[in-house]
Structures are given as structure tokens and as C-alpha cells.
Amino acid sequence: MQTAATSTFFANPHVKHLPGPFLRPSPHYGALVHLPSFRNKTPISIAMAASPSPPPLQELTITRPDDWHLHLREGDVLAAVLPHSAMHFGRAIVMPNLKPPVTTTARALEYREEILRALPPGSNFVPLMTLYLTDNTSPEEIKLAKKSGVVFAVKLYPSGATTNSQDGVTDIFGKCLPVLEEMARQEMPLLVHGEVTDQHVDTFDREKVFIEKILAPLVQRLPQLKIVMEHITTMDAVNFVESCKEGHVAATVTPQHLLLNRNALFQGGLQPHNYCLPVLKRETHRQAIVSAVTSGSKQYFLGTDSAPHDKRRKECSCGCAGIYSAPVALSLYAKVFEQAGALDKLEAFTSFNGPDFYGLPRNTSKIVLRKSAWKVPDTYSYSSGEIVPMFTGNTLEWLPSDQLEE
């Protein structure tokens, strides 16, 4: 694993008086090199100019990415946010935590049709549906899901862990074990929100404790079950994923957990638009995740966890968890890999590792990322209100093209 990027993001993107959103590395001014003198055999010092670095890349063409963790909601919110994902992503794993949740294959088929009806004309975007695992899910439902050809995974929400998770699992090794065994037989991946919900566990330790108490025993008990640890936030998660067999355990990574640490929640006042679950962690964890995803490992792939909420539900006394990143995600991932000197590994993370893990073909179309500054809108309006995007009002450097190259 390579070391973390030296140029990192610490400033809060929602505080306008702070420096620009990305800190730059210090310039390299050259070095003094000692060489021997052939006459007197004593060393002499000469100033050596730094080797000129190649000009920064201005354009990058990659296979069209997929989003392996996306919240699309329903109704007018779905209609407003879907074009942002469909513009740049070929497919997306669509989360099932609606009200009520998508617990059956029949409901997944209905939701899929709602998404397809909301697509912009001419869009080739493909929603990959998921089921919401409950204590009452049956092995027969897993068989139906596999047979449908449109349900690609089952999502585990520990009850009370995040938005609309109140119907989630309370007894994974008891009530859910027959379902998980059937999933292993059907090669149906389990997508895990990896946090315990015990009230005595510190919020910042919920992922670590989940790995120790739930995930590690689950992998040991069902080694053939394919598991995706969603939106990882800690070096503990990195270490666990890399201790597991490639092709059986993987992880999605969000832009916010690559670019922000927990300071971003509090700089310049409480920042509700940086609040998500799992919550942002300390800087050492962020660096570990950057190192992992930019190392070239096949066990990590793009999952934005883009989670739109109305502005009024974020800026209130009890705000919702979730960051709306779909419009800016590719720009931010490109920046992370550029800062790490790993743009050559961006395509595998965005476009190859995900479909390879799921056993799906890679996309054949291309998309272009250009170095062209653009300003993130303050809000996106929809019929019932406004949604504030990640890095609202900031200027980003990489601009994904709207036109695909075949």
C-alpha cells in the first residue's frame, strides 16, 4: 500500500472565508548534491535544479463509471436527482431504504419501473436493485430475487443505524442465518452498513466494534458469502478488507470519506451538510482510506452514498444524515487520485473493480474528465424545495463531460 497523499483537504467547503477547497503541496526548489573532485579527491557542492516535472494532465478518458451505492428516493426528489447520476454513471446499486422499505422482489420491480420512467430521454442508465434485509426475510425471497434478474444484492441495515433503518436486522446470527446461507448458495452479495447501534458504544467506534463483533465472525462462519462493506470510514475497515480473500470481501468508498475528516463537521460552526452516517472520522483514518483506494487494490470501488435531503431537513434542530454528492462525485474522486499521484489507477476504481466483483460486464462507453474549473451550484431546486450539494458554492478543477465517447 502506498503512502497517503501529501496534499490533503482540511478546510471546510461550506465556510466561504477559509482557503480554497484543496491545499497545494509545497513547490520543490532543488537540492544540493555532493560530488567528488577528480583532482583533489575532496567533495564539492553544486546546486542541482530539480528535474522538470511533466506538465499536469489536462484531459483523462476513462471507461464510463458505475456507482455501487446510491440513494435515489422517490417521487419529485427522484425526478430531480436521477439526471445527475444518469449523466455520468452507467449503472448504480440502488439502496432500498424507502418508506416503507423495499423488502420483496415484487416491490423492487415496481421501484425499478418508477426509476426507469423518471430517466431523461435517451438515457442508458441501468438501476441495479437491492432488497432490504429484515428479521423476517425468507430464503424463498432470495431465490425469487435471484431469478428476477434485476435484484443484484441484499442490504443489511442494523436496526436504527441510519436513515430509515428502523425495520433493519436485530438478530443476524439467529433469524437471518438461513437467509444468508441461501444468499451464499445463490451468489447474492450482502451489502453491509457496518455499524453497531449499542448505545454504550462511542459513535466514532461503531464501525470498529461492528467488524469485531459481527463482520469478522460472519466471514468466518460463511466464507463463501460475498460481502461489500459499504462506505468504509476507518483504517480498521481497511485492515479487515485486506485481510479477507479478494473476490469475497470488498468495500465501497465515498468522496466525503476520502476528502473530509471530522473537523469538517465543526469548522466555522456546525456544518449539517457535512453530516452523514457513518460519521466522518479523524485524519489518520482518512489518510488510510486514501492510501488503500489509490494503491490499485481490486477490493475497493466507487460508491458515492449520494443521499439527497431537502435543505430544510438538513438545516434544522435534528438534521438528517446524508450528503448529496452525485453532481460532484467524479470531480472529487479525480482530485483525490491526482493528489495521490495515482490518476493511472482512477479507472480501475471507478469502472472496473465494481463490475468485476459483481460478475457483471464492464461498460464499453467512455467518459472524458477535463481540467476545467467549474463552480458547484449553491442548491438544486425541485418541486417541493431545494437540495444542497456537497461542496456547495466551491470551485472544482475536474469537469466530467456530458457527452460519452464510444
Curated annotation (Swiss-Prot):
The keyword Mitochondrion appears for this protein: yes
Reactions it catalyzes: (S)-dihydroorotate + H2O = N-carbamoyl-L-aspartate + H(+)
Cofactor: Zn(2+)
One record GO biological process: 'de novo' UMP biosynthetic process
Listed transmembrane segments: none
GO molecular function, one term: metal ion binding
Protein name according to UniProt: Dihydroorotase, mitochondrial
